[in-house]
Amino acid sequence: MKNAPSNRLNLSVQYACNREGLPLRADFVRWARAALVGGGEVTIRLVDADEGQSLNKEYRGKDYATNVLSFPYDTEPVVMGDLVVCPSVVSKEAAEQNKPLEAHYAHLTVHGMLHLQGWDHDNDDDAQAMEDEEREILAAMGYPDPYAV
């Protein structure tokens, strides 16, 4: 008899930058779990702008630091992948968009977790579906619509 896939989330958080006010591992676990269908093996690495820029250039061909990068490895039997989050970009965006910082971290974690599960926003229909899913997940946790700017 084949074992059923696990619903367990094994989440590691790597704090590779010195920045006050970063979310705790427990926050990332809550946000990631809310977006995850089934189980997962995920690492979230918080990086400085230099590392974020280097990774974005290497993997996406864009020479700037971005808010979150997703590196999916597998979806069966559990989701496996890495998220790279750049706190300096997240903080700047939250301030510019007049969003609570915690809500922006929650949104980007959910967004990244959906990418790890195969969601994308390569065309308008996919983007709308992904945004709707993000809104639903975030609302269930009590966060505002991240796209109502």
Curated annotation (Swiss-Prot):
Protein origin, superkingdom: Bacteria
GO molecular function, one term: zinc ion binding
Cellular component, GO annotation: cytoplasm
Cofactor: Zn(2+)
Matching Gene3D superfamilies: Metalloproteases ('zincins'), catalytic domain
Binding residues for Zn(2+): H111, H115, H121
Residues spanning the membrane: none
Major location (coarse): cytoplasm
Enzyme class: hydrolase
Keyword Cytoplasm (UniProt): yes
EC number: 3.1.-.-
Assigned keywords, A-Z: Cytoplasm, Endonuclease, Hydrolase, Metal-binding, Nuclease, Ribosome biogenesis, rRNA processing, Zinc
Cofactor note: Binds 1 zinc ion.
GO biological process: rRNA processing
Keyword Zinc annotated: yes
Locations listed in the record: Cytoplasm
NCBIfam families in the record: rRNA maturation RNase YbeY
Function according to Swiss-Prot or TrEMBL: Single strand-specific metallo-endoribonuclease involved in late-stage 70S ribosome quality control and in maturation of the 3' terminus of the 16S rRNA.
Cited PANTHER family: ENDORIBONUCLEASE YBEY, CHLOROPLASTIC
Annotated family: Belongs to the endoribonuclease YbeY family.
Protein name: Endoribonuclease YbeY
Classification of source organism: Bacteria, Pseudomonadati, Pseudomonadota, Betaproteobacteria, Rhodocyclales
